[in-house]
Amino acid sequence: QVIRERIHHSGATAAYVAALGSVPYLYMIGSFMTDGHLTLKLFDFDRDKKIFHPLDAPPTNANIVKLYNNQLINDSKCVPANNEGAIGLAISFTMEILERDLPTEFVGHTLHVQLNTGFRFDNLPEEEEQEKIVKKLSYIIAELKKQADEVHLFISAQASVIVRLGSLYQEGLHGAINVWHWNS
């Protein structure tokens, strides 16, 4: 009974989440919040001050840029699945994930996305802008899923982006997702 009461919080209107951890762990935390009955309020960690803070900075006017074979593309349909029916999505917001950093089976089979504002920590510090960008990522995953049996994610982004992306996971839309812990 006590556990049930702590899980459901019928009077709650928002879920406040501050988390640090590996990329797969953060994605998993977000995926536990997919029912959408609570507004999600995410926090990021300030490495200098050593505290969590809300996403209340001014927007950066960021937009997603898609690349395949180092060429700008508009349509992800040009990215083929590998022989195992898998396709990769490299999300480079904090640091750039290069083709040579990927497992060999994903070289030539991975869409690279980044922000037009460059690479840096806490690249999306404003809540609404982050929501908009992450919804676009979710749409890209769904597009890639149409071309493959599985989508593999390689992510270099702030924790809140990863949690938010996990919260948008829908099995019917995204299918099997494999989240890799990418290290630079």
Where are these regions (language model features)?
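A short, acidic, amphipathic alpha-helical segment used as a generic capping/interface helix at domain edges
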Residues: 2-8, 129-147, 161
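Flexible, charged surface loops at secondary-structure boundaries
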Residues: 6-13, 79-85, 143-148
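Hydrophobic, ordered structural segments
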Residues: 10-58, 161-162
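Structural motif
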Residues: 18-22, 90-95, 154-158
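Short, solvent-exposed amphipathic alpha-helical segments in soluble enzyme
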Residues: 32-35, 103-110, 167-171
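Long, charge-dense
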Residues: 38-68, 118-124, 176-184
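Redox- and metal-dependent alpha/beta enzyme cores, enriched for Fe-S-associated oxidoreductases
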Residues: 63-139
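C-terminal functional regions that serve as terminal interaction/effector modules
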Residues: 143-184
